[in-house]
Every structure is written in structure tokens, then in C-alpha cells.
Amino acid sequence: MFKQIDENYLRKEHFHHYMTLTRCSYSLVINLDITKLHAILKEKKLKVYPVQIYLLARAVQKIPEFRMDQVNDELGYWEILHPSYTILNKETKTFSSIWTPFDENFAQFYKSCVADIETFSKSSNLFPKPHMPENMFNISSLPWIDFTSFNLNVSTDEAYLLPIFTIGKFKVEEGKIILPVAIQVHHAVCDGYHAGQYVEYLRWLIEHCDEWLNDSLHIT
């Protein structure tokens, strides 16, 4: 459900400034220590990519500024955002963008995500899964590139307010497994403080992965 924001919106002046006078988005790359997470996934024999998608999506639900959008020229936020993510056709080397309904229950989301990837993995269409919802955000994966900087130039008649994530190739540094993730947000709805909140919660989820990964005991 989309909830409109009323005139009491505290960032009203900021929103209008970055939507009209200085229209801009900004990007940042964070390095995530996934050493503990990687070990648990290996032990449980879980696929890495669906877990990465779950982490990014769950953190999005936590921060309202990452769910803000404009619908029919009205500013507001989605109560829930579902992840849309890229997958590679290994034969044609083309990618598709599919989506999976978000579920905070890890086991349920994991099963749905794995099933979606398997179903559409051989498609050559850009959007093979029908009925993509309006309340979704984008994730891309570049597992071949260990990047330190990344930027998307989104050119549309209207400002794209929802966040965009790009996952890079993990590397080993001083015995730690480090995963680069690029985050792009629009300054009209998201300040550096809100981006910092998102990153802090994402790192918390990774550090406490053993708690929510216990749900995977019920994956069959």
C-alpha cells in the first residue's frame, strides 16, 4: 500500500530543492565483511545470491526514506518494497530482471527466490516474470567485477526516487571476505544520514546472521 505524506513532512523544503533547483542522485560503495555469513551459508549449503537479495530487501523495509516514491504526483512511501533483481542466462549471456515478493521470514523468501531463479534462468527476455508490481526496487549483480566506485546515469522525464543496488565481486583481504555493494539514492528523499542508517542496519543483519538464518532449518 502507498501512503501519502502530508504537509507536515519535515523535509519538505529539502525535497523541493533537490527536485527542482538541484536535481541529483548520489552513489556510494560500501565494503561489507561477510566472513561469518559466508561460513554459515557454506555450512548450510545455501545459495549466496538469494541471501544477498534478502539482506538488501530487509534493510530497505527498515528505512522509510528508502521506500519513498511519487505516485500520481503525490509524495509518499510504500509500506513494503519487493526486490527486482538480475539473473544471467548462462547459454546466451543475456540477463533478465525478475522479482520475488518480499517476506521477512528468511526461509519462505529463500525458497520463493530460488524457485523464481530456476524458473526463469533460461529466458532471453528482459522481464520474463509477469505482473511486476509498482512497489519494487532494483538490484543488479556484477560478480565479475571488484569495483570501488559505481554510478548509474538514470535519464527519465521524472525523477527516479527509489534506491538502486549493485552487488560486486567479493574479495579476500587479510583473511576477511569483503563484498562491495553500490547504493544509489535520490537526494530529494534520502540524505546521507538516512543512507548511514541503512548501512548500519545492513551490517547489523550480517553480523547477526546466525539468528535469522536459523529459519533455514525449515527449508526443504
From Swiss-Prot:
Keywords, in A-Z order: Acyltransferase, Antibiotic resistance, Transferase
BP terms from Gene Ontology: response to antibiotic
Induction (UniProt): By subinhibitory concentrations of chloramphenicol.
SMART domains in the record: CAT (SM01059)
Protein name: Chloramphenicol acetyltransferase
GO MF term (any one): chloramphenicol O-acetyltransferase activity
Enzyme class, UniProt record, top EC level: transferase
The keyword Transferase is assigned to this record: yes
Pfam families xrefs: CAT
Catalytic residues, chain numbering: 187
EC number(s) reported in the record: 2.3.1.28
Record PANTHER family: CHLORAMPHENICOL ACETYLTRANSFERASE (PTHR38474:SF2), SLR0299 PROTEIN (PTHR38474)
Role according to the record: This enzyme is an effector of chloramphenicol resistance in bacteria.
Keyword Acyltransferase: yes
Subunit details: Homotrimer.
Cleaved signal peptide residues: none
Family classification: Belongs to the chloramphenicol acetyltransferase family.
SUPFAM superfamilies, sorted: CoA-dependent acyltransferases
PROSITE patterns for the chain: CAT
Reactions catalysed, as given in the entry: chloramphenicol + acetyl-CoA = chloramphenicol 3-acetate + CoA
